[in-house]
C-alpha cells in the first residue's frame, strides 16, 4: 500500500505541475492576444506616410494672385527655356499677354478690410520651361516695408468657373499660404506641387524655392522715385509629390494570431478540466482503498 500511495502522490504532484504549466501558458496566450490587439489598434490609429512622385507632361494652370495695393501692373509676359529678354522702356511694355482677372473682396478675417487681387493664369508647359514674368510699379507707400504679397492656388480655371469670385478668393486666403517679394529685386519663384491624401479629404500645397537678384536701375533720378517690382513664376520640375497615409495593420494576420491563441486557450482549459477530474478520481479511489483497509483491520 505505501508503494501505491507513493505512486498516487507522485501522479497528483505531476498533474499539479502540468496544470500550473498550462496556466502559465494560458497567461502568456492572453498577454499575446492583448498585445496583438493593441498593436493592431495602434497601427490603425497611426498610419504611416507614403511619398511617391508622379511625372506629368504639363501641369494644370495654377492661379497666381498678387495683392498690389497701390502698385499698378506694367507688364505680364510668358517666356520659355529660362530666357527673359532684356528690359525695355516702360512705354514699350506689353501688358496683355497674360490672362488675368481682377477681384475685389473683403478679407476672411476682417470684414472691414477690402482687398484688390490680380489673378493670373500660371505656366503649364513644364517641359519647355515656361515662365511668367510680371513687372509692377509703385510711386508711394504708407507701409514701413516695401513688398507685395502673393499666393498660389491649385487651378486658375476653378476661379473662372466660380459664380462668386469674392467668396472663392476668401476661401483661397484661408487655405493657402501667403508670401511676399520686395521692390528693387527680381524674385524668381520655382514652384512644386504636393498633394496630400488623408482619410477624409485631399489637400493641395505649393512649395517654392526662390532666388533674388538686385535690379540695376538705369533710369533718370527723377523716375527712380517709382519703385519697380519684378517676379518670375516657373515650375521646378515635372513631378507631383503625392503624400498618402497608409494603414500597415493587417487584419487577416491579426485574426490568424487570435484564432491560434484562442485554440490554445480552449485546449489548455480542456486539459486542465480533464486533469482536475482525473485528480478527483484518483483521490476518491485512494479514499475507497483506505476505507477497505480500515474495514479489513476492524
UniProtKB/Swiss-Prot annotation:
<feature type="transmembrane region" description="Helical">
    <location>
        <begin position="246"/>
        <end position="266"/>
    </location>
</feature>
<protein>
    <recommendedName>
        <fullName>Proton-activated chloride channel</fullName>
    </recommendedName>
</protein>
<keyword id="KW-0407">Ion channel</keyword>
<keyword id="KW-0406">Ion transport</keyword>
<dbReference type="InterPro" id="IPR029366">
    <property type="entry name" value="TMEM206"/>
</dbReference>
<feature type="transmembrane region" description="Helical">
    <location>
        <begin position="13"/>
        <end position="33"/>
    </location>
</feature>
<keyword id="KW-1003">Cell membrane</keyword>
<keyword id="KW-0868">Chloride</keyword>
<keyword id="KW-1133">Transmembrane helix</keyword>
<keyword id="KW-0812">Transmembrane</keyword>
<feature type="topological domain" description="Cytoplasmic">
    <location>
        <begin position="1"/>
        <end position="12"/>
    </location>
</feature>
<comment type="function">
    <text>Chloride channel gated by pH that facilitates the entry of chloride ions into cells upon exposure to extracellular acidic pH. Displays channel activity with distinct kinetic properties compared to the human ortholog channel.</text>
</comment>
<feature type="topological domain" description="Extracellular">
    <location>
        <begin position="34"/>
        <end position="245"/>
    </location>
</feature>
<dbReference type="Pfam" id="PF15122">
    <property type="entry name" value="TMEM206"/>
</dbReference>
<dbReference type="GO" id="GO:0034707">
    <property type="term" value="C:chloride channel complex"/>
</dbReference>
<dbReference type="GO" id="GO:0006821">
    <property type="term" value="P:chloride transport"/>
</dbReference>
<comment type="similarity">
    <text>Belongs to the proton-activated chloride channel family.</text>
</comment>
<dbReference type="GO" id="GO:0005886">
    <property type="term" value="C:plasma membrane"/>
</dbReference>
<feature type="topological domain" description="Cytoplasmic">
    <location>
        <begin position="267"/>
        <end position="298"/>
    </location>
</feature>
<keyword id="KW-0869">Chloride channel</keyword>
<keyword id="KW-0813">Transport</keyword>
<dbReference type="GO" id="GO:0061797">
    <property type="term" value="F:pH-gated chloride channel activity"/>
</dbReference>
<keyword id="KW-0472">Membrane</keyword>
